[in-house]
């Protein structure tokens, strides 16, 4: 009897490949970022907050496609590290906004400098420039 994941991989092989590439990207990102004591998941949250400047946890959850409980725990860790702060939401007395601190903006910039083009080059090292362009074009075509 086949496992559920085997059946899923047979039905949606492209999904499995995309998932594997994403996992490889996250592993590489974790390796690159480890000297700064930040994980790929934390970096993604910081980048998303940076792009929005100030965002509600619910909006951030949608951007990242993660569980709100997991995001809340992640935000708690980022607050403890001094990279994120929670502020009262002037439009919702019960809600909060999350914003990067000066330290959060600095670590975000350090991460960008550390990773730079190296991650992209490592991920695409077995592809020609034309293949990279084609892959990018096709993946964008799959997205809405």
Swiss-Prot record:
Residues 11-144 form the HTH marR-type domain. Pfam families: MarR. Keywords: Antibiotic resistance, DNA-binding, Repressor, Transcription, Transcription regulation. The keyword DNA-binding applies. It comes from the Bacteria. GO terms for biological process: cellular response to antibiotic; negative regulation of DNA-templated transcription; regulation of DNA-templated transcription; response to heat; response to stress. The keyword Transcription regulation applies. GO terms for molecular function: DNA binding; DNA-binding transcription factor activity. Changing residue 77 to L: Increased transcription of the region II transcript. PROSITE patterns: HTH_MARR_1 (PS01117), HTH_MARR_2 (PS50995). NCBIfam families: PRK11512.1 (NF008565). Repressor of the marRAB operon which is involved in the activation of both antibiotic resistance and oxidative stress genes. Binds to the marO operator/promoter site. This is Multiple antibiotic resistance protein MarR. It comes from Escherichia coli (strain K12). The gene is marR.
């Amino acid at each position: 009897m086949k496992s559920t994941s085997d059946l899923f991989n047979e039905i949606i092989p492209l999904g499995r490949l995309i998932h594997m590439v994403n996992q490889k990207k996250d592993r590489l990102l974790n390796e690159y970022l480890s000297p700064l004591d930040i994980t790929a998941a934390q970096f993604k949250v910081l980048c998303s907050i940076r792009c929005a400047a100030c965002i509600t946890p619910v909006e951030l959850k949608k951007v990242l496609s993660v569980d709100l409980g997991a995001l809340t725990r992640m935000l708690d860790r980022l607050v403890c590290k001094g990279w994120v702060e929670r502020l009262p939401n002037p439009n919702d007395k019960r809600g909060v906004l999350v914003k990067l601190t000066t330290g959060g903006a600095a670590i975000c910039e350090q991460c960008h400098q550390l990773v730079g083009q190296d991650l992209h080059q490592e991920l695409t090292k077995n592809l020609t420039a034309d293949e990279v362009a084609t892959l990018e074009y096709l993946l964008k075509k799959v997205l809405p």
